[in-house]
Regions:
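Structured catalytic-domain cores with a bias toward divalent-metal coordination
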Residues: 1-419
Length: 419
């Protein structure tokens, strides 16, 4: 993937294709296409993305295919009666990444249930059709892409959508059920499937779907294609500051993506910045892609900070501003912090042993009688706290001079102005 990113930066393709073979439910359509920008990204590019999608669908249909203009993601795994959900993908997928770069991409999904010759033929037809459409509209689309680049450089301080309501089932918020699109907004479609049965399997003990490809059947099922933002944030007005201790790792990532940044040669004193205080962090129960992911909640707040030399400044005023925000806004689904690059920020470096905390608590009571009253009130009003010895000692540890108040602070800062 890193090698591919280098090629993307070198070539800067206007349109790319991501070729896949998928499995899942069995049905008559032999190929599905999901084109972006259509559901996300620059508004002008969305219109042209729709033109690209519809043009490809028309070409494939004229050649005998039954193409779908969306990836057929079942609302409930292995249950055709549940219908489909239109998924808007995050930037770790090609359909989420290229809109951040103001470029077009086509997710091509043929079907593993079809024979090999069919898969090759429809993939070939798609590639040729894509090239033909670029030949017809490429100059216009390229001009629009460059206009989107210029517009993206002006997005500082603007509210941006970083995630959408969808049903992609890879965990993005650990320990929480994925929210499905509202059935009240679903529409019923007639989908060309096959007859099937769902019987309890003696092997798994679960319902197993078995299709009969010799018996075509029209499925009247809900299609949840209403796309709504689920995470909207205000982009930094000036840019993001990466502290010196993370400069090498993050700088390498930024270079791979073609994002411009500036090493800070001189320290900043009392800089007016924003910092993100993490209220809650939930780690994935197991590693994914070799990393321990984390989902965060919290908020930005203004403060003054000294910034040592060696930090990186990443200006928002550049064509890849959408990608910058996707990487640095901590709640974004594929931000650097979500992928575990700043997990050290959650570690407790210092601690007070219980016997020490007991002595410190008594000394703190003597020094500040109001603290004893506050502690007594919390014991009275919070039964869970009163019954938890660790929480009671932590009450004092957090108020002691040795406590690390930078724990649960996201290390990347925002600034309202260019540095």
């Amino acid at each position: 993937m890193q090698a591919l990113l280098r090629l993307i930066n070198q070539w800067d393709p206007l349109v790319s294709a991501d070729l896949h073979v998928t499995d899942g439910a069995d049905f008559e359509p032999d190929i599905s296409l999901q084109v972006e920008p259509v559901n996300q990204g620059d508004a002008q590019l969305r219109a042209s993305g729709t033109q690209l999608r519809d043009g490809l669908i028309g070409k494939l249909a004229a050649q005998g295919s039954l193409p779908l203009p969306f990836y057929p993601d079942l609302a409930r795994t292995d249950d055709p009666a549940s219908g489909f959900v239109l998924t808007v993908y995050s930037p770790r997928f090609s359909t989420g990444y290229f809109p951040q770069r103001n470029r077009f991409t086509v997710l091509v999904e043929t079907h593993s249930w079809k024979d090999y010759a069919t898969r090759v033929r429809v993939t070939r037809n798609t590639i040729i059709g894509m090239v033909e459409l670029v030949g017809l509209h490429g100059e216009q689309w390229l001009r629009q892409a460059h206009e989107a680049d210029s517009a993206a450089a002006q997005l500082g301080g603007v509210e941006m959508t970083l995630d959408y309501r969808s049903s992609w089932r890879e965990h993005t918020r650990y320990g929480q059920a994925e929210s499905q699109s509202d059935d009240a907004h679903a529409r019923i479609i007639e989908f060309r499937g096959y007859a099937y049965t769902r019987d309890l399997s003696p092997i798994s003990g679960d319902l197993m779907t078995v299709y009969d490809p010799k018996t075509p059947q029209i499925w009247r099922v809900p299609f949840r294609d209403r796309v709504e933002p689920s995470l909207v944030v205000r982009a930094s007005r000036g840019g993001y500051i990466v502290p010196a201790e993370h400069a090498e790792t993050v700088g390498t990532k930024l270079t791979l993506h073609g994002i411009a940044f500036e090493p800070m040669r001189q320290p900043l004193e009392n800089a007016q910045v924003e910092e993100f205080r993490i209220a809650h962090a939930q780690f994935s129960p197991e590693p994914f892609e070799g990393r321990q992911r984390v989902a965060l909640s919290g908020e930005w707040g203004r403060t003054q900070r000294d910034v040592p030399a060696g930090a990186l400044f990443v200006p928002i005023a550049q064509p890849l501003s959408r990608l910058i925000v996707a990487l640095f806004e901590p709640q974004a689904p594929d931000s650097l912090v979500a992928w575990g690059f700043f997990n050290a920020s959650f570690e407790q470096k210092e601690q007070l042993e219980p016997y020490v905390a007991e002595q410190i608590a008594k000394a703190m009571f003597d020094a500040d009688p109001s603290l004893q009253a506050e502690f007594a009130l919390k014991l009275k009003d919070d039964p869970a706290f009163a019954a938890d010895p660790s929480a009671r000692l932590d009450f004092f540890c957090r108020r002691h001079a040795s406590y690390d108040h930078r724990r649960h602070l996201y290390p990347v800062l925002r600034t309202d102005s260019a540095l």
